[in-house]
């Protein structure tokens, strides 16, 4: 096991998996540290089998035999604003006895090769961004999918978000939820608009996973819908922004109750492409 930057790399089943250090119980000595950590990871990892977090073996117990690949239908609302959309999301059906008949879109942030050199419209109505971020306030066009940040040890954010997305997928399937994996591998050719449109059509809510800090554990928070009046009056934001914020508050509340560090008040206002095009409860959650 390697520990640093507020999270750890657990080696198991021939692979390496990134886990928040808060889930790993420290061993009494360096000699037994790796074994102890593998015994004391969170209940999430305990439910996985030897394949490790997000591995195929751990998933098979709760997934349907034939996951369904789903591409973007250009006739869907807002699909015409997408510039990168040749990739496919993957829909997993839960086989748990307590099926909820609800689908959660799990969006592993970043991971679109070439996404940083393509621009898409920030808002459906062409208005400029009202907050800063990857794209500056006042811009009408944004990067289709940014490359994300790099952790202090050189690991790309996209790699870590995918590992966490697979862990979340397995937990949701075990709890009876179907899961639309927006990105199920290292690269998916779906820009942020395409990801939102797919979630709008095939899911009941949309959760995008990200990290925001590099050298320390900043804490968890979600990107809330800006309080700017003109932004909140724009569709589809006007009809859905309260649902977006409620979902974010619920997720941060759950993370807080589980003992995770929360940054500031748990939210930060941000004008995102994701929520600008979302018609289901949708949130970008930063996990540290």
List where the protein language model places each region.
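SH3/SH3-like beta-barrel superfamily modules
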Residues: 1-23
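Catalytic-site microenvironment of enzymes
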Residues: 24, 28-288
């Amino acid at each position: 096991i390697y520990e640093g930057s507020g999270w750890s790399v657990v080696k198991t089943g021939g692979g390496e998996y990134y886990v928040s250090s808060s889930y790993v119980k420290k061993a009494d000595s360096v000699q037994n540290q790796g074994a102890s950590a593998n015994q004391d990871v969170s209940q999430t990892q305990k439910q996985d089998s030897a394949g490790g977090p997000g591995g195929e073996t751990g998933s098979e117990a709760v997934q349907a035999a034939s996951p369904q690949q789903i591409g973007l239908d250009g006739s869907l609302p807002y699909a015409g604003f997408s510039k990168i959309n040749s990739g496919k999301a993957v829909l997993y059906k839960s086989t748990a006895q307590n099926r909820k008949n609800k689908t959660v879109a799990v969006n592993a942030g970043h991971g679109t090769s070439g996404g940083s050199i393509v621009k898409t419209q920030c808002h459906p109505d062409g208005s400029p961004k009202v907050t800063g971020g990857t794209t500056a306030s006042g811009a009408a066009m944004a990067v289709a999918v940014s490359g994300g940040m790099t952790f202090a040890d050189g690991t790309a954010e996209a790699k870590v978000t995918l590992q966490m997305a697979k862990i979340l997928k397995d937990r949701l399937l075990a709890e009876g939820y179907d899961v639309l994996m927006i990105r199920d591998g290292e690269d998916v050719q779906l820009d942020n608009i395409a990801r939102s449109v797919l979630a709008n059509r095939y899911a009941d809510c949309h959760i995008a996973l990200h990290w925001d800090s590099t050298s320390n554990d900043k804490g968890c928070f979600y990107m809330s819908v800006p309080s700017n009046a003109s932004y909140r009056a724009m569709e589809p934001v006007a009809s859905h922004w309260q649902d977006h914020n409620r979902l974010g508050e619920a997720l941060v509340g759950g993370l807080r109750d589980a003992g995770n560090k929360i940054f500031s008040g748990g939210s930060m206002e941000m004008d995102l492409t994701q929520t600008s095009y979302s018609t289901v409860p949708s949130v970008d959650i930063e996990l540290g």
